[in-house]
Amino acid sequence: MSYKNQSDCNHLSKVIEKAEAGDKIFQSTLGTMYYQGDGVSIDYEKAFYWIKKSAAQEHINAMYNLGYMYWSGEGTSEDYEKAFYWFSKAAEQRFAPAQNYLGMMYRDGRGVDQDFEEAFVWFLIAANSTLSCSILAGKKGSSEAQCNLALMYIEGNGVPESQEEAGHWVNLAYGQGSEFAAEMIDEYELWDYID
């Protein structure tokens, strides 16, 4: 066995040991490792098990990830009400990706009654948030939430239609390198609003 492989085994053993001892950080780490196949085979059920243990101890990433797993049905049955609960717990801690998912749930009526105004509020909070610890989250507010706000302005859902406001939010997301924002700029002809 090479040193790198031995090192990987030692790291995994320590993560498992600390997770089994109840450390919420290592439980979340182990769950993420199983989810992504990082040093272990992908196993969504094991990922769900460890992430749920960590979320029960209010680890912010785990609460978000558990919400996502209920949202997507990975490692468990799809359950939008439970997804909403866990996204809400993480959103209360000002976690932008969870705030964005709450916006999507209100916009689409998944797990809650459809409410464009409430969706707008959550997208706005997420778009301006600086707490984005997730691997998938942006560093200057959630670019996904910024694009969702732009779509609300383009479609006039919960807000008056406004190309200018849509352009403002797409510009912020585009500045973070969002591919979705780049597609929106072309599709909705928002080039005049891009810095």
Task: Report the location of each language-model feature.
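Hydrophobic face of amphipathic alpha-helices that form TPR/SEL1-like repeat modules
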Residues: T29-Q36, M63-S72, Y101-D108, N148-E155, ...
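Terminal, low-structured helical/coil segments at or just beyond the last alpha-helical repeat
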Residues: L172-D195
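Short helix-capping/linker turns of helical repeat alpha-solenoids
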Residues: E20-D23, Q36-D38, D43, A56-H59, ...
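TPR/TPR-like alpha-solenoid signature
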Residues: S28, Y64, Y85, N100, ...
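Repeat-mediated protein-protein interaction surfaces in helical alpha-solenoids
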Residues: S7-K18, S129-S134
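Alpha-helical tetratricopeptide repeat
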Residues: C9-L12, I16, K24-T32, K52, ...
